[in-house]
Structures are given as C-alpha cells and as structure tokens.
C-alpha cells in the first residue's frame, strides 16, 4: 500500500531575528558612510578647498558605482547565496571605511575609499528581499524588508544628526573632520566583523511551502521582469521617487543654507526626515501585512507625502522645515519597504535580489541626474519640479494592480509554526 502524501510541516526559526539584526548593522554603517559629508558640506569644502559639487561627488560616487555594479552584485547573491554576497560587501566596507579614516585629510584618497565603500553597497542593499525570503514566511516579509530599510534610515540619521557634532573648528576658524571619519571607519569595521561572525545562509527547513521559493536565474529573471507591465511602472516610480530622495539628502546642506540654517539645524532637518521614515517603515509594512494589501497602502503613503515635499520647497523658517521634513519622511519613506516587497511578489519567480537591484538601479540613476540638475537649476526651483514628479508618481501608483501573492487564499497555508 502506498502511503498517502502528507503536508510538509512549515517551521520558522527564532534565529531569523539574529539574521535580520546583523544585516541591519551592516546596512547602518554603509549608509552612515554614504552621507557622512552631506550635513557638513560647507566645512568639507573648507577642509579640501574644493567646490560644493565636488563635495556632492562623495554621494554621487555611491549612486554611480551602484549603477555599474547593481546587476553583477545581484548575480553573485543569487548564484552564491547571501552569506558570500553580503560577506563581500561587509569586507569591502570594513577595509575602505578604515582607509577613509586613516587618509581623512587627502581628498583623492577619500574619493578612492568612498569608491570602495560604494562598491560594498549593492552587495548589501540588493540582499534585503533575499534575506526576507530565505528566512521569513510570506506574512512577515514586508516587515522584514521594513527592518532592512529601517536600518538604512538609522545609518542616515546618525550621519545627519551626529556628524556636525564630531567636526571641530579652531580659534582661526579652521575645520577638522579627521576625528569624525576615523570614528566612522572603526564603527564600520566592527559592523563588518559582527556580520561575518553571525550571518548564516539559510534555516534548517524553508519558511514556506514547497515551490514558493523557486526562482529564475538572474538574466532569465531580468527578461521576465522587463515584460511585466506593473514592474515597468514601478521602475518609473523608483526613478522619480528614490531619485528625488537621493538628491534631497545629498544636497540637504545647500537647501538649508538658503534658509540660513547652521550645521546643527541642517542635520536635524535631514535627521527628522529619516527619523519619521523609521517610524513609517515600522507602521506601514505592519499594516500592509495585517491587511494583506500592498497597493492601497503605498498609494496612501505616496499621496500623503506630497504636502511634506511642498513644505520643504516653500517653508521660510526652521520649524516649518522640521515639520515638513517629518511629514515627508513618515509617508514617503514609510511606503518604501512595501514597494520593494511588492516588486518581489509581482515578479516571482524572478530572484528577489534582482528585482530589488533593478529598482535601486533606477533610483540611483535618477539621483545622479537630479543632483546634477539641482546644482545647475538651483535648489528651490528643483524642489518645485520634484512636487510635479510626486504627482506623476501618484498616478503611476493608481495604475498598478494588486499583488496576487499577498491575497489571503495564497498566504493562509504559508504561516509557519515558530520554533
């Protein structure tokens, strides 16, 4: 007699929270390095004797290197796994973070170190959805993605708020940034070691039913994604939305300088956007997972972010900038992890790291173009253009279709038994 087939027992493991925690640590330090000059651009200009655009170049390097290495990094992650993929990023971050601190006084050497740090970024960022799929059930994946994105915000928050307090100025008005860069270098190296010690490739048993984690190869997945109508719309959304965010955070010192804000106030304006983004990235993914809806939630956050952007463009005083920054960050950044998870779901069985990498690629290209445009057109006129772009994004959100994977009938069998 042939035994009757039985349903496989699905288990999720508590160690998944260790995985997402160490992944968060490496995200924090890499994003900290990205924006280390953003709130102190004027001081950095004085130290290196260069133009504002040359200081913005430290951020542009991150965006440009991501554009070049996005797909190769996704290939490594999908071919060799998250331990090797993220591990490569961690090693690069640790080495070049220390180099940036050791050669802090030399503009060229700092540019080289920043390039190495930028190379680490796609190996780490492109792994977010892969980590979520490898370790978490479908009903926790937007939450896991939200934690990954939250950690990126935390790194940016530290860069924005703490950096102005780590630079020094002597009686002659000469700035020093060496202590700040060395401190960040040591923190980055420690974060890399923590990641390498605790990261594991996969749990003993998968967190989903058989077949739910089957994936195309990278280039087959790319072809699949580029034939997907909703993915094309999502790429356009990230080109405009993430591009605007990258440009605003890069040029935050120039934006605030027009309003007469000092370094500390500039850092708080930028930090407020990111702090509220952390709150939003906790609240909205939980709502999305609980309601089992993606489109309705990110459409809501996209529309609600527009008044905050209008305030950043029009506010004439410090408190207006703070309030507007909070409003924009809470809704604009709060919807981001849902969009990443939505992209992974509508493109299944394409690799998650490839879908996330393609979306990030669009946003980085947009960021490069928008930073250059802001330095040419001017800060306030560019912010007005961004308001128009946000309205376009709201229309694109409306045109998208809901993810089928998140529907209740498909997720009811996928909840695991915690072990």
Which role does the model predict for each range below?
Residues 5-13, 202-234, 415-419:
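Juxtamembrane intracellular "pre-TM" segments in multi-pass secondary transporters
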Residues 37-38, 228-281:
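Extracytoplasmic gate region of multi-pass secondary transporters
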Residues 344-378:
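A late C-terminal transmembrane helix in Major Facilitator Superfamily
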Residues 69-81, 280-293:
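Helix-to-loop junctions at the C-terminal end of transmembrane segments
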Residues 113-151:
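Cytoplasmic helix-loop-helix junction between adjacent transmembrane helices
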Residues 68-107:
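Conserved MFS/SLC helix-loop-helix module at the cytosolic interface between two early adjacent transmembrane helices
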Residues 292-339:
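C-terminal transmembrane helical hairpin of 12-TM major facilitator-type secondary transporters
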Residues 79-90, 289-302:
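Cytoplasmic membrane-interface "Motif A"-like loop-to-helix N-cap segments
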């Amino acid at each position: 007699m042939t035994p009757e087939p039985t349903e496989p027992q699905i288990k999720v493991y508590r160690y998944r929270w260790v995985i997402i925690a160490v992944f968060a640590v490496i995200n924090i330090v890499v994003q900290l390095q990205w924006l280390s000059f953003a709130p102190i651009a004027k001081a950095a200009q004085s130290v290196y004797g260069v133009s504002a655009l040359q200081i913005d170049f430290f951020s542009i390097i991150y965006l440009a290197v991501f554009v070049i290495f996005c797909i190769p990094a996704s290939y490594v992650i999908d071919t060799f796994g998250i331990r090797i993929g993220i591990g490569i990023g961690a090693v690069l971050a640790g080495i070049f973070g220390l180099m940036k601190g050791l050669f802090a006084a030399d503009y060229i050497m700092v540019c080289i170190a920043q390039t190495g740090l930028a190379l680490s970024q796609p190996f780490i960022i492109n792994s977010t959805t892969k980590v979520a799929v490898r370790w978490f059930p479908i009903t926790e994946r937007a939450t896991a993605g939200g934690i990954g994105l939250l950690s990126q915000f935390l790194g940016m928050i530290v860069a924005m708020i703490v950096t102005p307090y780590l630079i020094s100025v002597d009686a002659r008005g000469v700035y020093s940034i060496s202590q700040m860069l060395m401190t960040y270098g040591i923190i980055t190296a420690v974060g890399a070691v923590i990641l390498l010690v605790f990261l594991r490739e996969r749990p003993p048993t998968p967190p989903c039913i058989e077949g739910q984690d089957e994936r195309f190869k990278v280039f087959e997945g790319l072809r699949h994604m580029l034939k997907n109508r909703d993915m094309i719309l999502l790429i356009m959304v990230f080109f405009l939305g993430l591009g605007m965010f990258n440009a605003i955070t890069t040029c935050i010192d120039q934006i605030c300088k027009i309003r007469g804000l000092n370094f500390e106030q500039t850092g708080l304006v930028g930090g407020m956007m990111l702090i509220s983004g952390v709150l939003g990235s906790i609240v909205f993914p939980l709502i999305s997972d609980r309601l089992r809806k993606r489109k309705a939630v990110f459409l809501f956050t996209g529309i609600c972010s527009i008044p905050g952007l209008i305030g950043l463009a029009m506010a004439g005083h410090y408190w207006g900038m703070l309030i507007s920054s909070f409003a924009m960050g809470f809704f604009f950044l709060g919807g981001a992890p849902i969009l990443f998870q939505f992209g992974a779901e509508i493109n299944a069985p394409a690799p998650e790291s490839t879908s996330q990498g393609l979306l990030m690629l669009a946003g980085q290209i947009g960021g490069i173009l928008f930073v250059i445009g802001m330095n040419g057109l001017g800060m306030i006129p560019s912010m007005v253009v961004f308001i128009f772009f946000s309205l376009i994004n709201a229309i694109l959100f409306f045109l998208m279709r809901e993810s089928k994977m998140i529907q209740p009938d498909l997720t009811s069998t996928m909840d695991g038994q915690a072990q």
